[in-house]
């Protein structure tokens, strides 16, 4: 039996401060659901899995750049037996202008079972519009920290579990205090700091950290949880980022941003590499490993 997932401190505190959760069994599904198969979105390259939330299948993106698991508003409205929480007096912090709703439900994701999982509810229309196939939500590090998974972009294979044939080395990274990790890569003589963000299709780097310098101005369509829009921005000249001992993202051309914009290591930089996550007892985010 897989142990119940740990909750983030502020949510655990909120739940135990006056809310008692009833043991509500999830409704049985009418057909078997494959919880183990991962697919890659044809347009944006994020990895998607089917999960069961209170027994209902939901297509969820694996997003190491998200602190919390989130359901799209329309998908959340379809749930049965969910416990909705009053959020009117809660303080939320994040990069969205939306005020999230919150529900408690059973979440089955791959090999993991979180019987009473807090799930944010937000409008994900902007995110969904960027993808080839629409998703119901996002699996954040609140659940992913406890699950092993592998993105093997050498072979085009994505799966729950860890590989047996990869020479893995620790990703150069540190915790950011919210369950996520900040990659501390090396580009030439400069350190490059980026959020590890498998929910992003592109890599974005602070201009002053990109050793190869600026390239050309390009037009790009970018999206976040609130907006999807076309903008013009600078692209960096091609360069390499060392991500682990002897492992580098080679020949990448990241988008360049100023200090007010969050830098991120996206799925484009992981092409040809193997990214592995291993849960650990002594870390809120687990251990990320990488191979060439």
Positions of the model-derived regions?
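Bacterial N-terminal signal peptides that target proteins for export
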Residues: 1-11
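Pepsin/retropepsin-fold aspartyl endopeptidases
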Residues: 22-292
């Amino acid at each position: 039996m897989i142990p119940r997932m740990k909750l983030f401190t502020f949510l655990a505190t909120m739940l135990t401060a006056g809310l008692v959760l009833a043991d509500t069994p999830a409704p049985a599904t009418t057909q078997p659901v494959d919880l183990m198969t991962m697919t890659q979105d044809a347009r944006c390259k994020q990895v998607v899995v089917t999960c069961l939330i209170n027994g209902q299948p939901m297509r969820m993106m694996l997003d190491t750049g998200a602190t919390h698991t989130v359901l799209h508003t329309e998908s959340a409205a379809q749930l049965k037996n969910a416990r909705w929480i009053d959020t009117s007096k809660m303080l939320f912090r994040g990069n969205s202008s939306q005020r999230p709703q919150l529900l408690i439900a059973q979440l089955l994701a791959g090999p993991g079972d979180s019987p009473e999982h807090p799930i944010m509810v937000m409008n994900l229309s902007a995110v969904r519009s960027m993808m080839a196939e629409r998703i119901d939500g996002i699996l954040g590090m609140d659940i992913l920290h406890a699950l092993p998974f592998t993105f093997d972009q050498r072979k085009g294979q994505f799966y729950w579990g860890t590989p047996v044939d990869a020479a893995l080395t620790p990703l150069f990274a540190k915790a950011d205090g919210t369950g996520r990790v900040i990659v501390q890569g090396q580009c030439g003589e400069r350190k490059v700091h980026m959020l590890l963000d498998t929910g992003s299709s592109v890599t974005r780097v602070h201009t002053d950290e990109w050793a190869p310098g600026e390239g050309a101005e390009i037009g790009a369509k970018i999206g976040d949880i609130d907006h999807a829009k076309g903008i013009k921005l600078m692209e960096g000249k091609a360069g390499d980022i060392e991500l682990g001992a002897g492992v580098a993202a080679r020949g990448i051309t990241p988008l360049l941003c100023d200090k007010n914009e969050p830098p991120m290591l996206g799925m484009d930089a992981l092409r040809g590499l193997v990214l592995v996550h291993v849960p650990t007892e002594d870390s809120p985010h687990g251990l990320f490993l990488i191979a060439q």
